[in-house]
Amino acid sequence: MTEFWIERWREGRTGWHQPEGNASLRRHWQGTGRRVLVPLCGKTPDLVWLAEQGNEVVGVELSDIAVGSFFEEQALSFEVRDGELREYRALDLPITIFLGDYFRLRGESFDAHYDRGALVALPPDKRAAYVEHTRSLLADRAEQLLVTLEYDQDAANGPPYAVHADEVLDYWPELVRLESRDDLPNGPPKFREAGLTEMIEVVWRSTRDL
């Protein structure tokens, strides 16, 4: 799975990327002064938006192409520190991206978690391990904003994968469903090409307000 995503970035096949960021984040995020974990962050401009709201933002990404593209496209200067995961730290905003395997991120603690592209990127047999590792990094009662997709996987398949409500609540029973809307026009082109007629974006948040 790791090599799959690295190859997609290498080939420029990144139909899941949202160049303008995620609109649901901007509608529903209210927190400030948090240390926010963003797993499998890619080059999303959501990192900048979260930092501009007064948060310290920490992303984790497999692809060096994605990390380099993020800093170039956002015109951010940065410094690099070597470690088990290479650390790219912006000089102008409180943003850090760790390059490498998310499951090797340890010794960190976060009081907020934003996931727009991680859970839906993982096949079913990888999701429970992702959730368990994420929980190990979060403080008690950490704030969470999760964005998932629901669609007919007989008509099209991921990634990004459909993750339906019963599965989400098995993983995160503390989450409440805030919003559901058809987001097929903003989804990966391959879904429309496959004839998919609906792709529901669902927004979940922890029961404690951000």
Region locations from a protein language model:
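Class I (Rossmann-like) S-adenosyl-L-methionine-dependent methyltransferase catalytic domain
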Residues: 1-33, 43-46, 56-95, 99-106, ...
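Short amphipathic alpha-helical interaction patches enriched in hydrophobic/aromatic residues
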Residues: 13, 117-118
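Class I SAM-dependent methyltransferase "Motif I" SAM/SAH-binding loop
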Residues: 37-44, 118
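Conserved catalytic-core segments centered on acid/base and nucleophilic motifs
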Residues: 47, 57, 113, 119
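Gly/Ala-rich phosphate-binding loop of Rossmann-like dinucleotide-binding domains
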Residues: 51-52
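A short acidic, Gly/Pro-enriched loop at the edge of an enzyme's catalytic core
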Residues: 105-113
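A short, conserved alpha-helix within the catalytic core of class I
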Residues: 121-133
